[in-house]
């Protein structure tokens, strides 16, 4: 897990509510972060005190990998969104698919909103329904070759799950409906593989599932 702190330095820490930033820090040469560091008070406290105490410093190689991931995120997201849109369009034209929930599809009620606030793409995680219900959904999952059957999302690999038979299998049909999940709902997280491989895998698994 990694994270980034962005501090504009404009918050008034000297308002009586943050003594740890105002009073001298005896563990760090008696420094007063607000008085001695000015706008860098908060970020200096994180770096000089909290990071030191909790030990959340990663190895040089892991730091390098984290930076590489962050610096190339925008490039990967372009491919994620490009592949996801093509998959959504492909599924929306398949006669064995009952619905596709993807905001960039023209018939989505969120289309105009998505294009206004997410002009570069609306992500790569979405759901669709496969005619044949729960049984077809399970069969579809079992016959995929490219997709990995796991519950997480956002990987560079394409991922899939059938909630009704896995993550939400403890719910009754009525409870599934209340949760906004149909028995034929399948969740996809589209990865960076070649789009032809992704579409081929979906088609062959759908064909088998609805036989």
Segments and roles (model prediction):
Residues 76, 133, 142, 158-211:
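PLP-dependent enzyme catalytic core of the Aspartate aminotransferase-like
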Residues 1-125, 129-157:
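Active-site C-terminal subdomain of aminotransferase-like
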């Amino acid at each position: 897990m990694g994270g980034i702190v962005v501090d504009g330095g404009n918050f008034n820490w000297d308002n009586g509510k943050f003594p740890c930033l105002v009073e001298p820090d005896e563990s760090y040469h008696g420094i007063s972060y607000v008085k001695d560091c000015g706008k860098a008070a908060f970020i200096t406290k994180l770096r000089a005190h909290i990071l030191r105490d909790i030990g959340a410093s990663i190895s040089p190689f892991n730091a390098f990998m984290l930076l590489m991931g962050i610096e190339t995120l925008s490039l990967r997201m372009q491919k994620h969104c490009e592949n996801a849109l093509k998959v959504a369009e492909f599924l929306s034209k398949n006669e064995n698919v009952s619905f596709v929930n993807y905001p960039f599809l023209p018939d989505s009620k969120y289309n105009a909103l998505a294009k206004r606030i997410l002009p570069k793409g609306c992500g790569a995680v979405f759901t669709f329904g496969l005619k044949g219900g729960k049984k077809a959904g399970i069969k579809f999952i079992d016959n995929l070759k490219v997709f990995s059957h796991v519950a997480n999302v956002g990987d560079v690999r394409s991922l899939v799950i059938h909630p009704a038979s896995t993550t939400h299998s403890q719910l009754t049909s009525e409870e599934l409906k209340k949760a906004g999940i149909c028995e034929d709902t399948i969740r996809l997280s589209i990865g960076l593989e070649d789009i032809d491989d992704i579409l081929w895998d979906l088609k062959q698994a759908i064909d088998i599932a609805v036989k």
